[in-house]
C-alpha cells in the first residue's frame, strides 16, 4: 500500500510539474502571437459579402501584425464545411473563421451536422452588420416591393429567389419576406452568393434578398434593380432605395451580420488578445470607411458582447425556422 501511495504521489508531482512548465510556454506563445501567417477561413465562394469583408479584414490585420493574413475560401453545406474545418483546427489561433448568421444562428436547419457551432467555436467579435437589399432581374414586372408582392400572389410559386445555401442569411431574409408578405415564392439554394447572382443576372431566377456589398455594383450599373432595403434606415450606399418599412412591409426590417471566430480549443486569453488587436484595427478610419463604403456598419465588440448578441439572434431566427418548417436534411 505504501509503495502504491508513493507511485501515486510521484505521478501527481510529475503532472503538476509538467502543467507548471507548460504555463510559461503558453503565455510566451500568446505574447508573441502571431509569429507566422494567420488564415481567415471564409466558408463561402469568392466574390460574396463574406469574402469581401474577410479580405478587407485580412489586409488591415496583416498591417497591424506585420505578418501575412490570408483568406482561404472553403465553401459548402451553407458554410459548415469551413466551420467544421476551423472547429477542428486546434488551439494555436492561427486559423480563424469569418462567420455568419447561417453558421451561428440558423444551423438548426441541418439535422445531421458533425459538429455544433455554439459548442465548438469561440466568438471573438461581431465584424459588421448590414441590411439586405431586395434585388430583381430588370425584366421582372415589378418595380416596388408592393408590386412584387402583388405579382407573387397573382402567380403563386412562379417567382424564384436564390440564396447562398439553406440557412444562409440570404435564404432566411427571403423566408422572412414570405412570412411578412404572405408571398408564395420558391427558394433555390446555391453553393454561394456569386452563383446565385450570376443566375439572377441571366434570368434563371427572378429575385435575391442579398447583402448590399454583393449587389451594389450591379445596381449602380443598372444590371439589377433594387426594390427595397431591409434596414431600419436607408443605406448611405443606396440612398434612393426605400426601406421595407417605407415600402409598406415593416416586418421585413432586419440586418445580417458577420463574426470572427476560432476553435473552442483556443485559450480564452488568446481570444481576448485577438479581440484587443481587432479593436486597434477598428480604430483605423480607413478600415471603418472601407466597410461603410460597402453599406456595412462596423461593430468590433468584445467576445462576451458578441456571444450575447448571437444568442439573441439565434432565438429570433429559430422562430422563422420553426414557422416555415425549414430543413436542409
Predicted regions and their residues:
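C-terminal lobe and pocket-closing loops
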Residues: 129, 215-283, 312-315
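An extracytoplasmic/periplasmic, membrane-proximal ligand-sensing/linker region
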Residues: 35-37, 179-180, 220, 268-329
Amino acid at each position: 500500500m505504501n509503495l502504491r501511495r508513493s507511485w501515486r504521489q510521484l505521478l501527481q508531482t510529475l503532472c503538476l510539474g509538467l502543467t507548471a512548465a507548460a504555463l510559461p510556454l503558453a503565455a510566451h506563445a500568446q505574447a508573441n502571437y502571431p509569429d507566422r501567417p494567420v488564415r481567415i477561413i471564409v466558408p463561402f465562394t469568392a466574390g460574396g459579402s463574406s469574402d469581401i469583408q474577410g479580405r478587407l479584414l485580412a489586409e488591415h490585420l496583416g498591417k497591424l501584425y506585420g505578418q501575412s493574413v490570408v483568406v482561404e475560401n472553403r465553401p459548402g453545406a451553407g458554410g459548415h464545411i469551413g466551420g467544421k474545418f476551423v472547429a477542428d483546427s486546434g488551439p494555436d489561433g492561427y486559423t480563424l473563421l469569418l462567420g455568419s448568421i447561417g453558421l451561428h444562428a440558423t444551423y438548426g436547419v441541418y439535422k445531421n451536422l458533425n459538429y455544433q457551432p455554439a459548442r465548438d467555436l469561440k466568438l471573438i467579435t461581431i465584424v459588421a452588420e448590414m441590411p439586405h437589399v431586395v434585388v430583381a432581374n430588370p425584366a421582372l414586372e415589378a418595380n416596388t416591393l408592393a408590386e412584387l408582392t402583388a405579382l407573387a400572389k397573382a402567380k403563386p410559386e412562379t417567382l424564384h429567389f436564390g440564396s447562398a445555401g439553406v440557412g444562409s442569411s440570404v435564404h432566411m431574409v427571403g423566408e422572412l419576406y414570405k412570412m411578412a408578405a404572405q408571398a408564395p415564392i420558391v427558394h433555390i439554394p446555391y453553393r454561394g452568393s456569386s452563383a446565385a447572382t450570376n443566375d439572377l443576372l441571366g434570368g434563371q431566377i427572378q429575385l435575391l434578398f442579398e447583402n448590399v456589398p454583393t449587389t451594389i455594383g450591379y445596381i449602380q450599373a443598372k444590371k439589377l434593380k433594387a426594390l427595397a432595403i431591409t434596414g431600419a434606415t436607408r443605406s448611405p450606399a443606396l440612398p434612393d432605395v426605400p426601406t421595407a418599412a417605407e415600402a409598406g412591409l415593416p416586418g421585413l426590417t432586419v440586418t445580417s451580420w458577420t463574426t470572427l471566430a476560432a476553435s473552442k480549443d483556443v485559450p480564452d486569453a488568446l481570444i481576448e488578445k485577438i479581440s484587443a488587436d481587432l479593436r486597434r484595427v477598428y480604430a483605423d478610419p480607413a478600415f471603418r470607411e472601407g466597410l461603410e463604403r460597402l453599406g456595412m456598419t462596423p461593430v468590433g465588440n468584445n467576445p462576451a458582447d458578441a456571444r450575447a448578441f448571437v444568442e439573441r439572434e439565434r432565438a429570433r431566427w429559430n422562430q422563422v425556422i420553426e414557422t416555415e418548417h425549414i430543413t436542409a436534411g
